[in-house]
C-alpha cells in the first residue's frame, strides 16, 4: 500500500527498481536490488507470514494495521495518553553528555517536548560490536520510516529511536560475533546484565583478531578505528554500544535510549508492584497466549513475576515462596513490605522481562510504531490485552526489513550458473539437481517408462481380477515395489551424472555457504563490519536507499561489476 495514494505507490515501485551507484573514488561498483515475498524464502514462520497477509486468525491480536491509516489511528490513541515528555527529554539530554551529539539529534530531542512529535522505535540488546546484520537493518528501517512519515504527515514530527535492551543477561547470545564465517566468543568472568559489563582485555583481543581479518579491505582501517574508539577498556558494554550506534547514525538524527535509568523506571513502579504482588500481567498474557496457541507456536510465556532483581553483578528472577520473595540462586530475600520499600526506593534494581519490557518502552516514549523481527512481533502479538488493561497505547507493529547482500564474486558465480533470485534460496541438492537436469545430454527421468508400466499393471489388474478378485491387491503391491525400484534407479542415474558437474557443485556450495552461513539467513549470522570494510559508508546508504516502509518484501542486493 502506498503512503499517500498513487504518487507514493509509484515512488516505491521506482525505488524498488533503482540502482544505487557507489560514488567513492576507490569503488566503481553499483548495486541492484530485487524484492521477493517473504514466503518464498522459506525462512519465516507461519505467524509472520500470516501477519503480513493480514490473516483473519491474527486480527484480534493487534490494534492497528501496518499502513498509513494505522499510523494515524495510533497517533490519535497516543494523544490521549500522558507521556512524561519533560522527564524523557531531561534524561536524554543527560545521557547525550557522554557522546558527541549532532545538531539533528539535539533538534530531535528538543522536539520530543512537543505534543505533536512521536517516535518510531526499534530495539535490541547490546551485542558485542552490534552482533548480527539485522541490528543495523532494523535501525535503518526506523530512520527511513521516520523520514518518510515526516514527508507525508507534515503536521506531525517523527523521530527514530533505538531502545537498548542493555539489561539482558544472556552473555552466550550477546557475546558472540561472526566475521566472514569465523566465530568469535567473548569469554569473561563478569556476570549479570551484559550492558553493565565492562570492556576487558579478552574483548579487545577479539577486536585485534578481527582487525587482522579486515584491515586489508578498502575501508577496513576505518571501520576498525570506529569500533576501537567506542570499545575502550573499562567502558560498559551499554556505553560502547551507545557510542558506536551514535557514530554510525548521528547524522540521521537517531536517538539512542538507555532505559537502565532510575528516574525512567519510577514511571513503572505501579505496574511493577502490580506484577510482583498481584501477578496481573501473568494472568492477562496467559489468557491471550492460550488463544494464540490454537493457531501458532507461542513465542514467550509469562511467569508469575515478570521482573528480575538487578544489582551489581546479578540479574536473577524474583520468586515468591509463601510470604517470602527470594532472588533465585542467591541468598537475597525480602518480606512483602521490604520488597515494596526496595521497589519504591530503588526502581533501577528491577528489570522487566520480555513481557513487561514492551510496556516500559511504550510508557516512557511517545511511540506510534515498533519495528521488530519475526520473534519480536510474535511476542508483541501476545500483549494487546495487557496494554489495554493498563491503558497504554499499543503501537503499529512493522516487521523489520530483511536483506541478503551478494558481493561481486558470488554474484558472478550466480550469473554463470544462470540462477534466479528465487533459486538461491533452494537447497544445495535441489540446485545441483536442477543444473544437472537442465544441462545433461542424457535421460535421467523415467517418467515415460513409469507411465507405460503403470498402464501394463492396470491392464494386468483387470485380467487377474476376472480370475480372482483378491489378486488385485497383489498386483498393486507388485506395482508399488517396482516403482520404488525405478525411483532408486533415478537417484542412481542422477548421482552418476552429477560427477560430470563437479565444478558446478563446488560453485553452488561456495554460493550457499557465503549467503547462508550455518544454513541460516546471512543477516542472522554475519556482522556488519566485513561489509563496511569493503564498501565504507555506502553500505549504510545502500541499505537505506533500498529499505521499504510498509511494503513488506525480502530484499536481495547484488554488487555488480
Language model feature labels by segment:
Residues 44-99:
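Low-complexity, highly charged intrinsically disordered N-terminal segments
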Residues 298-368, 374-385, 394-396, 401, ...:
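A translation/RNA-centric and nucleic-acid-associated enzymatic feature enriched
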Amino acid at each position: 500500500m502506498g503512503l499517500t495514494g498513487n504518487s507514493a505507490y509509484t515512488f516505491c515501485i521506482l525505488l524498488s527498481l533503482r540502482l544505487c551507484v557507489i560514488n567513492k573514488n576507490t569503488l566503481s561498483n553499483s548495486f541492484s536490488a530485487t524484492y521477493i515475498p517473504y514466503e518464498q524464502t522459506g525462512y519465516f514462520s507461519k505467524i509472520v507470514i500470516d501477519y503480513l497477509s493480514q490473516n483473519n486468525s491474527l486480527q484480534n491480536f493487534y490494534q492497528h494495521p501496518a499502513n498509513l491509516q494505522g499510523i494515524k489511528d495510533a497517533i490519535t490513541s497516543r494523544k490521549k495518553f500522558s507521556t512524561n515528555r519533560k522527564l524523557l527529554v531531561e534524561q536524554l539530554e543527560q545521557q547525550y553528555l557522554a557522546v558527541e551529539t549532532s545538531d539533528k539529534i539535539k533538534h530531535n530531542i528538543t522536539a520530543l517536548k512537543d505534543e505533536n512529535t512521536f517516535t518510531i522505535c526499534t530495539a535490541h540488546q547490546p551485542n558485542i560490536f552490534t552482533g548480527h546484520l539485522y541490528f543495523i537493518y532494523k535501525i535503518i528501517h526506523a530512520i527511513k520510516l521516520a523520514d518518510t512519515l515526516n514527508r507525508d504527515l507534515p503536521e506531525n514530527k517523527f523521530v527514530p529511536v533505538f531502545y537498548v535492551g542493555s539489561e539482558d543477561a544472556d552473555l552466550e547470545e550477546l557475546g558472540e560475533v561472526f566475521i566472514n564465517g569465523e566465530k568469535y566468543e567473548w569469554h569473561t568472568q563478569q556476570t549479570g546484565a551484559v550492558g553493565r559489563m565492562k570492556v576487558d582485555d579478552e574483548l579487545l583481543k577479539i577486536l585485534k583478531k578481527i582487525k587482522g581479518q579486515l584491515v586489508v579491505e578498502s575501508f577496513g582501517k576505518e571501520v576498525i578505528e570506529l569500533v576501537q574508539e567506542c570499545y575502550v577498556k573499562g567502558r560498559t558494554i551499554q556505553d560502547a554500544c551507545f557510542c558506536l550506534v551514535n557514530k554510525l547514525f548521528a547524522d540521521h538524527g537517531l536517538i539512542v535510549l538507555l532505559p537502565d535509568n532510575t528516574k525512567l523506571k519510577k514511571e513503572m513502579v505501579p505496574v511493577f508492584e502490580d506484577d510482583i504482588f498481584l501477578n496481573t500481567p501473568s494472568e492477562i498474557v496467559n489468557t491471550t497466549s492460550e488463544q494464540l496457541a490454537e493457531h501458532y507456536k507461542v513465542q514467550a510465556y509469562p511467569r508469575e513475576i515478570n521482573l528480575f532483581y538487578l544489582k551489581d553483578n546479578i540479574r536473577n528472577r524474583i520468586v515468591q515462596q509463601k510470604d517470602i520473595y527470594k532472588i533465585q540462586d542467591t541468598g537475597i530475600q525480602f518480606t512483602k513490605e521490604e520488597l515494596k520499600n526496595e521497589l519504591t526506593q530503588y526502581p533501577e534494581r528491577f528489570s522487566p522481562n520480555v513481557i513487561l519490557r514492551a510496556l516500559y518502552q511504550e510508557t516512557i516514549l511517545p511511540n506510534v510504531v515498533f519495528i521488530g523481527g519475526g520473534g519480536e512481533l510474535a511476542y508483541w502479538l501476545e500483549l494487546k490485552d495487557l496494554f489495554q488493561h493498563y491503558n497504554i497505547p499499543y503501537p503499529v507493529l512493522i516487521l523489520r526489513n530483511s536483506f541478503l547482500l551478494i558481493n561481486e564474486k558470488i554474484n558472478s558465480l550466480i550469473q554463470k550458473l544462470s540462477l534466479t533470485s528465487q533459486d538461491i534460496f533452494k537447497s544445495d541438492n535441489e540446485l545441483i539437481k536442477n543444473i544437472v537436469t537442465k544441462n545433461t545430454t542424457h535421460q535421467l527421468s523415467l517418467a515415460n517408462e513409469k507411465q507405460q508400466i503403470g498402464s501394463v499393471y492396470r491392464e494386468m489388474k483387470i485380467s487377474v481380477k476376472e480370475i480372482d478378485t483378491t489378486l488385485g491387491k497383489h498386483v498393486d503391491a507388485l506395482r508399488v515395489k517396482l516403482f520404488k525400484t525405478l525411483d532408486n534407479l533415478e537417484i542412481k542415474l542422477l548421482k552418476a551424472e552429477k560427477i560430470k558437474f563437479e565444478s558446478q557443485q563446488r560453485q553452488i556450495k561456495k554460493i550457499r555457504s557465503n549467503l547462508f552461513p550455518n544454513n541460516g539467513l546471512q543477516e542472522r549470522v554475519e556482522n556488519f563490519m566485513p561489509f563496511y570494510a569493503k564498501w565504507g559508508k555506502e553500505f549504510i546508504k545502500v541499505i537505506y536507499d533500498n529499505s521499504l516502509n510498509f511494503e513488506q518484501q525480502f530484499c536481495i542486493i547484488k554488487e555488480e561489476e
